[in-house]
Every structure is written in C-alpha cells, then in structure tokens.
Curated annotation (Swiss-Prot):
Signal peptide: 1-20
A GO CC term attached to the entry: extracellular region
Organism: Agrotis ipsilon (Black cutworm moth)
Protein name: Diuretic hormone 41
Propeptide: 21-79
Keyword Secreted: yes
Keywords linked to the UniProt accession: Amidation, Cleavage on pair of basic residues, Hormone, Neuropeptide, Secreted, Signal
Length: 139
C-alpha cells in the first residue's frame, strides 16, 4: 500500500514541474477577446449548437465544436455487433416443452393399453367360446 502513495507523490511532483516550465515550441496563446464576440454574425448562426443559449458567449469551444463535422466527433474504435445476445433460456424452454409432451404421449399410450386390456377382460371380449383356449388360459 505504501508503494501506491509513493507513486502518486512522484506523479504529482513530476506533473507540477512540467506544467511550470513552458515548452520551447509551444503555440502562441489564443486571443480570447477576438473569439469572444457578444453578437455572432449571420454566417455562424447555423453553426451554433442548441447549447449555445445555455452558455454565454464566454464559451468559444461551442463554436469550434459546432464547426466540426458530426462524423469526426464520434469515435470509430470498435464496431458493435448487431446480433442479439446469446441466451440459452429460449432453447431450454423449448426442450423442456418437448420433453413434457413426449412424457405425456407415453403416459397416454400406457393408459390406452391398460384400458384396452381391461375391456378385453370383461364383457363379450373377455369370454372365449372355445374350451381349448380357456384351458390354455387357466392352466
């Protein structure tokens, strides 16, 4: 934990030393009075953003940003994929539904077989007229 505090102190000290000394090849400072006109002329009215009403004429960066084309302001670093996110919820619910339908079909077939056997044992279906079949049946 101590190294982190030491690192922060070194970065702050180095930053203050760099900011105090002007660079030899630096640009000349901007004349803010020239850019800060209280009444913009008709040519720049189209370039004023809707935020210009909120900020007074003391914000010349609004004019500079409004003059830039819109596509240059957006970063084209990463292209977002347009596919929907992958999820297993829908396929799993479909599989669960198919499994429950298959189990219900098997239970229905089993119940139909039990009913068929029950109906074969009672009434006319269960009575055999030939004695040889009855003898084989009960032996």
């Amino acid at each position: 934990m101590m190294w982190w505090a030491l690192w922060c102190a070194v970065v702050v000290a180095a930053g203050s030393g760099v900011a105090a000394a002007p660079a030899p090849d630096s640009l000349s400072p901007l004349d803010m009075v020239q850019m800060d006109s209280s009444a913009p002329d008709d040519e720049t009215l189209y370039a004023m953003s809707p935020m210009a009403a909120r900020y007074s004429a003391g914000a010349p960066w609004l004019y500079l940003l409004a003059d830039m084309p819109r596509d240059s302001q957006t970063g084209s670093g990463r292209v977002k994929r347009r596919m929907p996110s992958l999820s297993i919820d829908q396929p799993m619910s479909v599989l669960r539904q198919k499994l429950s339908q298959e189990m219900e079909r098997k239970q229905q077939a089993f119940r139909a077989a039990v009913n068929r056997n029950f109906l074969n044992d009672i009434g006319k279906r269960g009575f055999q007229w030939t004695p040889s079949v009855q003898a084989v049946r009960y032996i």
